[in-house]
Amino acid sequence: MKNIVFIPKVKGTDEKRLREVAYDLSVESWKRWCDKNDCQLFVMEDLVHDYDYMKITWQRYYLFDMLDNNNVDYDQVLMVDADTIVHPDCPNFFQMSEHKYCGVNAVGSMDWICRSIENYSHFFFKDVK
């Protein structure tokens, strides 16, 4: 069993082509990191549902189903966005996690975070006012 780095990178429409170049760089950086640290890179290239039904930001949470359906045996899994680039000398964080659920604090846009909480909270916290 290997540790898995999971990246959703589904081809977009023509107006999203410029982003894909950056996403290719991201995938390449993670591929090199995985090779260096004896991990397996798993790139989600196909949608699970039509994009109009469910955005990719939600579809990525099917990752365990995708790994199981592709007969991927895994120890630990990292889910990372395709707009990240890992430093080539980044330590193998799988060796630091103690097999616990871990996350990173990503404070890119506080406005986006606040709007997300306001707009999605009623789906998850129906009783909270």
Where are these regions (language model features)?
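Conserved beta-strand scaffold positions in the cores of enzyme catalytic domains, especially
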Residues: 41-43, 77-79, 101
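A broadly tuned preference for mixed-charge, low-complexity surface segments
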Residues: 2-3, 127-129
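Short His-Asn-centered micro-motif
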Residues: 7-8, 45, 80-82, 88, ...
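Short beta-strand-to-loop acidic/aromatic patch adjacent to the donor-nucleotide binding site
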Residues: 64, 74-85
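Conserved donor-nucleotide/metal-binding helix-loop-beta segment in metal-dependent transferases, i.e.
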Residues: 86-128
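N-terminal anchoring/stem segment of glycosyltransferases
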Residues: 1-74
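Surface-exposed, flexible loop/turn segments at secondary-structure boundaries
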Residues: 13, 49, 85, 109-110
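Short linear motifs at secondary-structure transitions and domain/linker junctions
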Residues: 15-19, 51-54, 77-80, 114-126
